[in-house]
């Protein structure tokens, strides 16, 4: 029987101080300003998802959706540590996203290291609350996955799953954008919001009035991005279910006698060697 793990889907929204270029983690003016967190059990329907938005500013709940819990922070470092606090609070078994090994996790690591200077607190992502996760670099390549190189935090007790390389391995598509993949497999997509639109919403959404509060225009702007960010994470969790990712990974791990994370971080040879070693052990 396959267990029903608790799954957390997350997504970042990042601001670029130069609207004509992609956000850069080393650029001081760029920052993470929203993190959507969608929590569910394996085989849950969307109505049972717990939706949370961690954010700078003050998004309008009428825009993001009344079913979304909004947690507001004053600074980027508070937001990043708030993400760790959320993980410790909800204690998911699996943390999933789309291209999280290629962007989200390396970006979080870089920002937490500098300029936020909160890496030690941020890295406490494992089951043991006061234990810092080890920073590791994965480098390998295969015909199925291509060249893989990324940084990640080895958080004890948590399984990180990036759907992008799994989809690329199993399906031949013209494009692998989340919009294209979600439209094809689940018939859903997210609101049309360009990168420049996101940056503009941040500029508007972080402006305070003279009394220090946020006006309706600012709240609406941050709410628009917040809704978009939440949609991203909901879609990823639905894809995780639709593609039967958990069942596929657990069954393959059983057959190959390897940990699940090894399936997409160490190539094909480890699967063969592990079975050979098991046979040798049985034969003495």
Question: What residues fall within each predicted segment?
Answer:
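Short secondary-structure boundary/capping segments
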Residues: 23-29, 104-118, 126, 253-255, ...
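Short, flexible loop/turn elements at secondary-structure junctions
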Residues: 12-16, 39-41, 101, 165-167, ...
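Common nucleic-acid-contacting/processivity interface regions adjacent to the catalytic cores
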Residues: 199-284
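Extended, Lys/Arg-enriched charged tracts that mediate electrostatic binding to polyanionic substrates
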Residues: 1-18, 127-146, 151-153, 277-278, ...
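Conserved RNase H-like, two-metal-ion catalytic cores of nucleic-acid enzymes
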Residues: 1-94, 115
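Active-site-proximal helix-loop-helix substrate-binding element of RNase H-like nuclease domains
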Residues: 47-54, 61-70, 74, 91, ...
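Short glycine-rich phosphate-binding loop at a beta-alpha junction
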Residues: 92-100, 252-253
């Amino acid at each position: 029987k396959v267990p029903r793990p608790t799954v957390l889907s997350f997504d970042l929204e990042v601001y670029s101080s130069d609207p004509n270029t992609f956000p850069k983690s080393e650029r001081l003016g760029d920052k993470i300003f929203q993190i959507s967190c969608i929590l569910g059990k394996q085989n849950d329907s969307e109505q049972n998802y717990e939706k949370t938005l961690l954010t700078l500013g003050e998004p309008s709940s009428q825009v993001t959706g009344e079913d979304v819990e909004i947690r507001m922070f004053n600074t980027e470092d508070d937001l990043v540590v708030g993400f760790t606090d959320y993980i410790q609070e909800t204690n998911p078994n699996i943390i999933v996203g789309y291209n999280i090994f290629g962007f989200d996790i390396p970006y979080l690591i870089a920002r937490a290291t500098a300029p936020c200077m909160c890496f030690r607190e941020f890295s406490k992502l494992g089951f043991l609350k006061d234990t810092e996760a080890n920073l590791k670099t994965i480098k390998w390549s295969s015909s199925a996955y291509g060249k893989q190189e990324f940084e990640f935090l080895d958080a004890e007790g948590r399984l990180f799953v990036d759907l992008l390389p799994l989809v690329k391995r199993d399906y031949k598509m013209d494009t692998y954008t989340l919009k294209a993949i979600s439209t094809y497999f689940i018939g859903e997509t997210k609101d049309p919001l360009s990168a420049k639109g996101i940056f503009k919403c941040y500029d508007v959404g972080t402006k305070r009035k003279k009394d220090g509060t946020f006006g309706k225009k600012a709240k609406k702007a941050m709410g628009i991005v917040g809704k978009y960010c939440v949609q991203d994470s909901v879609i990823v969790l639905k894809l995780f279910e639709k593609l039967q990712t958990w069942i596929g990974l657990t069954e393959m791990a059983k057959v190959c006698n390897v940990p699940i994370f090894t399936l997409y971080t160490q190539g094909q040879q480890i699967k063969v060697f592990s079975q050979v070693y098991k046979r040798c052990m049985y034969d003495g």
